[in-house]
């Protein structure tokens, strides 16, 4: 299909620019004390939520390509849908299909993994031990393990990264105990050697992203490969000890640990001749550890010699750098994003966020492709994120992003801009209500200032989010006790158009099923173009 756009006959956009403001983690939750957005003072958002040009969008489950409507949305699939204008099957759904059909085990890649085992090597599975279904799902690991048993693989090690973010913040034992018992039972009943070898919390070990802190990856490398870390007899002992030593400790922040035998030796360091499978399906926190396992020339930390191993990811985590080189499940093939159409039309645009969400407004927005579509038309700006836990600095870089956006707008060079405020999501993940309120109020203030500039420039702003998080900071258990909630929510997200020049040229369509994929056509309409034929329909109807 050609990348051509047709102009609307009745609406040609406004004199000024179109600005898309993505408030990461800002959903439409219950109006009660669990909702940081409701509790916070947000005069600007309050006005938007009451305006005539306001609606709500689905941002989870099947609306963003995930298997069921019980699945939380996330920033990756959210920005894919926003930028692509259509819904594509995403990581978990693709992996489910490959595992259920057995297709994954008929690939040459799986054959190469098994060859290592048949020659005496160990198969290592590294990944997030969780059913959060955001980065991974423990069911996928269980199917992989069961197939190894059926295939007679003699030695398997699991390197268990603890979640506490997309699931309960102190829920690690709900996953570690069954996994420990499963591997022990396999070893006893089948005469095989299966067990947990190492682990640690996802925010301390292995799962860094966007080059924010390579020390996290280094700690993972040392635990998984070198067998260096705090020693324990079992992973259960490790978790229980961390809890006992610090009653405030949550799973995602646990340090690296290594399981040792009766002689104090690590039971499963990765050695020459082994195979390694990183079983997370989401890419952002899988790229760096994949680089460490595959790049011969590597300088991010003192890695030492690269072991002679075969490494495969569950999926290709970066389609442009082809990282990792070998993977088990093909990613969605996303084509014809809105930015490709706008570049073809010669529309100048910018994208900006801080490090934590920079990849979302660029790579994921562009259909999982790195770099510029047309460097002569696009400007990408990354504001370095703070290297602290975000409840300690809940304002993050929102003010700096806002200031840079205003600077870019006032050059009068850009017809379209997009930005992401990370606060609602990153601070929401800490489960600190006090910090989340500050985060939300900061975003509200920044949105207000941007709307003032858009008004001055006679432009249009669209304010939305990619998924919820800060809208549900805790739940209430049966005993009436508050349980901190660090995960994303299943709530819809806001969508508001701020058009100071509005004279009734269009109205909200209010469709029965509307989600993030409807935004791209809406943006095209607001720029004066018809929607693309096979994009999900616009959220506005021209009069």
Question: Locations of the language-model features?
Answer:
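Feature captures the catalytic ectodomains and active-site-proximal regions of enzymes
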Residues: 1-543
